[in-house]
Amino acid sequence: MTDIKSMTIDELKELMTQIGEKPFRAKQIYSWLHEHLVTSYDEMANLPKSLKQKLADYPITALETLDVQISKVDGTRKYLFRLADGNMIESVLMRYKYGNSVCISSQAGCRMGCRFCASTIGGLTRNLLPSEMLDQIYRIQTSIGERISNVVVMGTGEPLDNYDNLLRFIHILTEDGGIHISQRNLTVSTCGLVPKIYELAEEKLQMTLAVSLHAPNDEKRRELMPIANKYSIDELLAACHNYFDKTVRRITFEYSLVAGVNDSKENAQELAGRLKGLNCHVNLIPVNPVRERSFVRSTREAVENFKINLEKCGINGTIRREMGSDIDGACGQLRKRYMEKTESEK
């Protein structure tokens, strides 16, 4: 079945030719889907009835909103969406002075197995289509009636494990004629799929790459992230150096701080030594509590000291502002609770 919301304008032109319509209709349909964010052909006012009847064979991806939790602390909104096949995914709206930012999922579940992450507990169900990634943004923008200016692909899933769909998503998200979010306002995270980082570098996109590092050495990283058994930190950093050389875009390293595991002065100094010479920034994140995990988040003092020790060694760092701490803000938690509730009611 053709997924019309995942098609580029050129592909829509080909489809129009195939069904006996003029190519200019493609731009009209594309605008309705990706600029006006409609969810049915009936809303496409400038299309003839005959074309709408033909398009009935090409259903439009439209996520169903199951739940919205709104933080009383900072207005952060967490959305739970249901896909057409019944799978569920999460997205988060974060409000900043510079605009509205949405964190989206790239997969239903995740197979990377990071020890501190709720979204990987049930494993990977499937990859999301480009349209399903886009529609998280579209449904949220429609629900709040305000423009989304920034997107982070940092929700459930490993984006580079869904590489082809990710690239198509980026193309549609950032090109003219649609919602048109600048590449510079897009961040894509990865736990460190080294070959895919090299591939992505060749695209020369002007987005930010955020690499989940979480440890200063391979031994500690293997304790936290199974991917570290496949790719060493040296291999990962070599890919990051290449990425910067190709794109001239500063790398962000995500570092979740776990009490007594990776938050000491020595850990900070070792991390700084590893990152020296790379144009990068470290985002420090007190680990989110997850019921099924025994990890304890570092104290505020430990986090601040870690930042100070990094900066003494010449590495810039920031402490991530916690958003939605009162609404199950950690990745994957709302979805997991909803699935547990649904299962218990059977």
Question: Where are each of the predicted segments found?
Answer:
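Auxiliary Fe-S-binding modules of radical SAM enzymes
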Residues: M1-I89, H241-R250, Y255-K346
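Generic beta-strand structural signal
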Residues: R77, I89, N100-I104, M112, ...
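Short beta->alpha connector loops
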Residues: N87, K97, C191-P195
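Residue-level structural signal for beta-strand termini and adjacent loop
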Residues: L93-M94, N165
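Canonical Radical SAM [4Fe-4S] cluster-binding loop centered on the CxxxCxxC motif
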Residues: R95-E132
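Conserved alpha-helical substructure of the radical SAM core
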Residues: T120-N150
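Conserved AdoMet/S-adenosylmethionine-binding subsite of the radical SAM
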Residues: Q141-N150, G155-G317
